[in-house]
Amino acid sequence: FLLDYNRPQEVLALLKDWTRADPLLLRLTLAEQLTGANTFREHQAALAARYAAARMRGDTTHEQEESRFTLVVMKQPEEALKLAVSNWRLQREPRDARAVLESAIAAKKPEAAKPVLDWMQQTGIEDWYLRKLVAVLTGGGAK
């Protein structure tokens, strides 16, 4: 929420001591990236190592988070899209849909988001942020 509303300083204050849990460390790292914090590179490397270790164990439970990390922090949209689509096969919540849509936009592969678009239509989900992403994906809005 705070990152979506461009409030990274608040994220830094809230999460600076919460680096053991990967999802919290990701949000801290995203805030550090936005603010240029001197701990950004350290936390970026820590997350990269944790995600690599999880993949070596065959653990795919955090692919949605890893997708966001890969897209936003590592700036690798193609790889982020692969992770998001793989995650979508197992988990279908709005945040998982967001990962696919954001990665598909960044990778310039709107066709990869078709399963999410179908799901949104089938479920009738109403989410302003997902609708905004769909508009960008389909050429009906600017990001």
Question: Where are the predicted features?
Answer:
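Terminal, low-structured helical/coil segments at or just beyond the last alpha-helical repeat
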Residues: 53, 57-76, 112-143
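A C-terminal functional module that forms or caps the active site or interfaces directly
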Residues: 97-100, 105
